[in-house]
C-alpha cells in the first residue's frame, strides 16, 4: 500500500525536490503511527502483482473514516476505486459502524465522485498556512 501512496506523493506533492525525501518519509511514518492508534484496514486492488488502487478504513467505535483513496492514473476508469470503496463500506457495516466519514476538496473532482456514490456534504473546513518565521505584521 505504501508503495502506491509513495508514488502518488512523489508525483503530486507541491514541494521542492530538496524537501521531497523528508516530506515523503514523514508521511510514511505518519501511516505507521496511525496503524497503532485506531483499527486501520488497508484495502487494495492488485493487477499483475502491483497495487493499482487503494484506500484505508479507520474504525473507532461506531464511526469509520475512509481515507487515502488513490488509484494509479494509468488504471483509472476501470472500477477499481468503486471496488475499494464498496469493500470499505461493507467492512464498516461488519464492524457495526453507523457512520462513515471522509474528506474531499470542495473544488476538486473527487467530491463529485463520492456524491455519485451517495455521500453528502455535512460541513467544510478552512485550511491556512503561514511562512515559517513570518510575524502577523509581515503576513499582511
Language-model segments: what does each one mean?
Residues 1-64:
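Flexible, substrate/cofactor-facing loop regions flanked by secondary structure
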Residues 4, 19, 26-27, 31-34, ...:
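Ligand-binding pocket scaffold of soluble enzyme catalytic domains
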Residues 54, 110, 116, 130-140:
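Accessory recognition modules or surfaces
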Residues 62, 98, 120:
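Short acidic/polar active-site loop segments enriched in Thr and Asp
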Residues 62-73:
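Conserved acetyl-CoA binding element of GNAT-fold acetyltransferases
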Residues 71-73, 77-94, 115-116:
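Conserved acetyl-CoA-binding loop-helix of GNAT-fold acetyltransferases
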Residues 92-105:
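Conserved GNAT acetyl-CoA-binding A-motif
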Residues 101-103, 112, 120-134:
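Conserved catalytic-core motifs of GNAT/GCN5-like acyltransferases
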